[in-house]
């Protein structure tokens, strides 16, 4: 009897599980996120606003190697006193396809175009007020258009992933480089589409609005030498409802007390101290006389 009991107990112990599907915690499951307005807001902040940050060595506005810094380093606008393989090729125009600072803005941020495309699809099915949905979708369109323009300005036409391909990430699909017409149509369409849901001027510091959209459109049209449309955008920004104007003192634009002043069209938000004196450390010579420990 004891042998039979032990046998039954062993058989029970050897019983296997029937559900072997593990739950992943390192990726967003669209089956249960986003499901409400709060989720959709979080998805836009994390998927659309994320690349437009300045976090030391991360973000398209990084003070170390952003689009602007790398672009300006290839001119006489910016200078870096660090003598290494990162900066010298930029100042001497001797970069190659393997030069990290030449390619990092593509390798780090092109993927966000796919993230924004998926974000646009996912928030479109979330129940929320029409006004809020229009705003979040407009912000996503602006993010896609702006990032695509930055990448286009640096690298020319780039691959633009389709929603179908993004929903099937395990398929081995190599997206072709967009044609010149496809690229420019994508940028212009995204930016103009964003105008439908954005406020004229946001009351939330650091968020996108029509003023920013028209500014990027103006720069894009200038890039394409479409001077008539560029002028239209510029004249739009002069209208009183945008509230833009010049500060009496140039230095006052950047003081903490004047945060969000009338001369700022868009400001990248970050925690205070994140980039404290970072570019001074790059640009000033090693024997610069200062008592500032951050330099």
Question: Where in this protein do the model-derived segments appear?
Answer:
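TPR/Sel1-like alpha-solenoid repeat signature
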Residues: 141, 214-221, 233
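Conserved, well-structured interaction surfaces
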Residues: 41, 49-53, 80-155, 178-182, ...
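Short coil/linker segments at helix-helix boundaries
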Residues: 157-181
């Amino acid at each position: 009897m004891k042998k039979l009991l032990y046998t039954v107990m062993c058989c029970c112990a050897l019983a296997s599980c029937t559900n072997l599907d593990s739950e992943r915690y390192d990726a967003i499951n669209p089956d249960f996120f986003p499901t409400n307005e709060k989720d959709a807001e979080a998805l836009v902040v994390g998927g659309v606003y994320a690349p437009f940050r300045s976090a030391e060595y991360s973000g398209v506005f990084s003070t170390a190697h952003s689009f602007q810094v790398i672009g300006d380093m290839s001119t006489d606008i910016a200078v870096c006193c660090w003598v290494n393989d990162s900066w010298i090729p930029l100042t001497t125009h001797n970069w190659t396809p393997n030069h990290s600072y030449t390619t990092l803005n593509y390798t780090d941020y092109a993927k966000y175009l796919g993230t924004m495309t998926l974000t646009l699809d996912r928030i479109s099915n979330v129940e929320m007020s029409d006004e809020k949905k229009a705003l979040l979708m407009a912000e996503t369109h602006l993010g896609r258009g702006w990032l695509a323009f930055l990448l286009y300005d640096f690298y020319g036409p780039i691959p633009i992933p389709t929603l179908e391909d993004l929903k099937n990430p395990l398929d081995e699909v190599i997206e072709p480089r967009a044609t010149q017409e496809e690229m420019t149509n994508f940028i212009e369409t995204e930016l103009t589409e964003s105008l439908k849901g954005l406020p004229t001027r946001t009351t939330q510091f650091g968020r996108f609005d029509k003023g920013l959209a028209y500014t990027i459109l103006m720069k894009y049209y200038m890039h394409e030498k479409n001077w008539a449309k560029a002028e239209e955008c510029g004249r739009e920004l002069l209208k009183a409802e945008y509230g833009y104007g010049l500060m009496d003192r140039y230095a006052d634009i950047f003081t903490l007390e004047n945060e969000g002043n009338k001369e700022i069209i868009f400001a990248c938000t970050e925690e205070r101290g994140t980039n404290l004196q970072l570019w001074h450390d790059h640009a000033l010579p090693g024997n610069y006389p200062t008592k500032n420990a951050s330099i």
